[in-house]
């Protein structure tokens, strides 16, 4: 059991930290800037407080808040410390006691208590590869441009029909056209940079070519799978785990004699990735003979549209995961099941789920 539990509450410009000695119950609190220098100051505080307890008995824990938690997590990992980034929802709903009000100091103390209580569930944070981080930034920037383009286009559509003539309207339309062209050019530059990042590593290049061989998977979906799975290392090539993160894996509820709920997808997922995958599914249904045949079988079996399309998304994840595992490109005769995929990880072909 770790003797020192360190709870970190991350924010944009600072972080609050509570250091707790679980043996005697003493603790201390401090606040530092969310920078590598702040991380260094925190380590000095822990060393002073621990009084001879080695770093092997320290457990850093914080909420996985995405960008805000990355700076300190990276610093501690590079220095060889054990830091556990946990889902904020899990920490919040583990407290038991009813808390009224909120402040950063209390939050960091609650995280330290959580780290001590659930130490057996702790898993060490692993730094994503440099390529995965770069792809993630490029994808985020591309999405921002796509959203901006959508806003500009929708503004033009709002012009009443009676006002679509005249010098002012002509100027607005010309301006909109120029902006959209500029955005499209920037999107092309970002996509070219993504391909350059992938080309720098042979393993990434191989995965990218395999993913693009699947009819329906374009550059954005291929880059998403590589970036968010760190080239499929993050989820251990487990199709079920990937589908869960993408928000298309069904989960049911079964308890006693009265609770028997139809499996449905959870809203705890990355909704943007799910939307991007929906685009791939729509394309595959039209152009991919394997997926088209599968989709038509579901429709013929009487499944509703939502169930059919969600199963298609699951099928795509199963197939591309098997393709990556085998190192094979897609063709119409590709078989996605193999001995390395246990039956418990596979989805029923026509499961009633959303």
Which residues fall in each region the model found?
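Gly/Thr-rich phosphate-binding beta-strand-loop-beta motif of the actin/hexokinase/Hsp70
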Residues: 2-21, 111
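Short, glycine/acidic-enriched loop or turn micro-motifs at the edges of active sites
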Residues: 12, 66, 90
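Nucleic-acid-processing active sites and adjacent nucleic-acid-binding tracks
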Residues: 24-59
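Short, solvent-exposed helix-loop connector elements
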Residues: 49-50, 124-137, 164, 168, ...
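Acidic, metal-coordinating catalytic cores used for nucleic-acid/nucleotide bond scission
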Residues: 58-71, 99
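Long, charge-rich intrinsically disordered scaffolds of nucleic-acid metabolism proteins
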Residues: 84-210, 214
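Phosphate-backbone recognition surface of nucleic-acid-processing proteins
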Residues: 213, 219, 223-301, 305, ...
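Low-complexity, acidic/Ser/Thr- and charged residue-rich accessory regions of DNA metabolism proteins
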Residues: 257-258, 295-354
């Amino acid at each position: 059991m770790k003797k020192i539990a360190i709870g970190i509450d991350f924010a944009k410009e600072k972080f609050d930290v509570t250091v707790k000695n679980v043996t005697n119950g003493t603790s201390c609190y401090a606040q530092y800037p969310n920078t590598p220098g702040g991380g260094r100051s925190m380590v000095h505080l822990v060393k002073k407080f621990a009084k001879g307890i080695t770093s092997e008995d320290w457990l850093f824990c914080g909420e996985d808040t995405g960008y805000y938690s990355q700076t300190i997590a990276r610093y501690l990992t590079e220095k060889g410390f054990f830091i556990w980034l946990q889902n904020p929802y899990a920490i919040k709903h583990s407290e038991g006691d009813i808390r009224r009000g909120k402040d950063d100091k209390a939050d960091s103390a609650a995280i330290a208590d959580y780290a001590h209580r659930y130490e057996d569930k702790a898993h060490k944070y692993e730094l994503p590869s440099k390529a995965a981080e770069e792809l993630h930034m490029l994808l985020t920037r591309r999405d921002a441009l796509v959203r901006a383009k959508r806003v500009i286009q929708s503004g033009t559509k709002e012009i009443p029909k009676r006002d679509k003539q005249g010098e002012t309207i002509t100027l607005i339309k010309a301006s909109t056209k120029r902006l959209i062209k500029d955005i499209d050019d920037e999107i092309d530059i970002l996509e070219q940079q993504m391909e350059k990042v992938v080309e720098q590593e042979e393993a990434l290049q191989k995965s990218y070519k395999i993913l693009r061989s699947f009819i329906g998977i374009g550059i954005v979906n291929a880059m998403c799978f590589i970036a968010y799975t760190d080239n499929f290392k993050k989820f251990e090539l487990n199709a079920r785990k990937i589908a869960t993160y993408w928000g298309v894996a069904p989960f049911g509820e079964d308890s006693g004699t009265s609770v028997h709920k139809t499996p449905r997808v959870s809203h705890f997922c990355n909704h943007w990735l799910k939307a991007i995958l929906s685009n791939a599914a729509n394309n595959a249904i039209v152009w991919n003979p394997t997926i088209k045949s599968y989709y038509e079988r579901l429709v013929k079996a009487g499944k509703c549209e939502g169930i059919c399309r969600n199963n298609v998304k699951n099928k795509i994840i199963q197939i591309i995961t098997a393709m990556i595992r085998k190192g094979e490109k897609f063709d119409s005769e590709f078989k996605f099941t193999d001995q390395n995929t246990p039956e418990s990880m596979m989805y029923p072909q026509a499961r009633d789920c959303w």
